[in-house]
UniProtKB/Swiss-Prot annotation:
Effect of loss of the gene: Increases frequency of mitochondrial genome loss.
Chief place of localization: mitochondrion
Name of the gene: AIM19
GO cellular component: mitochondrial membrane; mitochondrion
Organism, as annotated: Saccharomyces cerevisiae (strain ATCC 204508 / S288c)
InterPro entries: AIM19
UniProt-recorded name of the protein: Altered inheritance of mitochondria protein 19, mitochondrial
Length: 157
């Protein structure tokens, strides 16, 4: 009988960091942290254009034919960073204004949208030694999961 409570205590200790993070979603602090990271991106890790690699003669990939720009970018642009930072700050204000359900849904949605826009680029930035986009994607993923769980746990009442 004493072995079972010991395993429950160990399980609680293992899950306690996740419970603490989930408890933080009652506050606007994780969203404000993400907004601050995104807003500081143009200063800490500005995006730059990567020159295209030379392809063999008469071999033009179709993605280059229909692409808007001829050079790829590493990292997110200043406009994108400030836009998503503003959206995170608006969601944080919603939670600060005691609208937990809508604020959590708003933050989860915009965090997921950031992952759609910048998630793949964050992995390609690793080839050029840039880890900041991966940090931003990781924090956005954590916000999307935690605030999304908070939003879905409300039961849509």
């Amino acid at each position: 009988m004493s072995a079972k409570p010991a395993t429950d205590d160990a399980k609680d200790e293992l899950l306690s960091p996740f419970r603490r993070l989930y408890a933080l979603t009652r506050t606007p602090y994780p969203a404000l942290a993400n907004a601050a990271l995104l807003a500081s991106t143009p200063v800490l890790s500005p995006s730059f254009k990567v020159p295209p690699t030379q392809s063999p003669a008469l071999s033009i990939p179709m993605s280059r034919v229909f692409s808007k720009s001829s050079t790829a970018r590493i990292g997110i642009t200043t406009k994108t960073a400030l836009f998503f930072s503003t959206m995170q700050a608006i969601g944080a204000y919603m939670i600060y204004d005691n609208d937990l359900e809508n604020g959590a849904g708003f933050i989860a949605t915009w965090s997921a949208l950031y992952l759609i826009v910048g998630g793949k680029k964050s992995f390609s930035a690793l080839r050029y030694g840039r880890t900041w986009p991966l940090v931003l994607s990781s924090v956005s993923l954590a916000n999307a999961v935690l605030y999304g769980q908070r939003f879905l746990a409300t039961g849509f009442q």
